[in-house]
Amino acid sequence: MAIKERVGIVVSNKMDKTVVVAVESRSPHPKYGKIVVKTKKFKAHDEENQCQEGDKVRIQETRPLSKTKRWQVINIMSHSS
């Protein structure tokens, strides 16, 4: 099975070694065809607490690290200004 990866924006870094990443997915509506944007939030492990709010990051699926955390930050693609 392939390892799942997502790209998203950090929306919260208030927790220790954990960030909340919002990931957008765009798909056409099944009946009307309009592109619909859906946002899903993932809790991801950030070992060095490097991520700041607004950073664009790549996350990867991993083994369960806590009750709700199953993703880890691979790299920070761009920092917020």
Swiss-Prot record:
One of its GO terms (cellular component) is cytosolic small ribosomal subunit. GO terms for molecular function: rRNA binding; structural constituent of ribosome. Belongs to the universal ribosomal protein uS17 family. InterPro entries: NA-bd_OB-fold, Ribosomal_uS17, Ribosomal_uS17_bact/chlr, Ribosomal_uS17_CS. The keyword Flavoprotein does not apply. The keyword Chloroplast does not apply. Pfam families: Ribosomal_S17. GO terms for biological process: translation. One of the primary rRNA binding proteins, it binds specifically to the 5'-end of 16S ribosomal RNA. The lineage of its organism: Bacteria, Bacillati, Cyanobacteriota, Cyanophyceae, Synechococcales. Keywords: Ribonucleoprotein, Ribosomal protein, RNA-binding, rRNA-binding. Part of the 30S ribosomal subunit. It comes from the Bacteria. Coiled coil: none annotated. This is Small ribosomal subunit protein uS17. The gene is rpsQ.
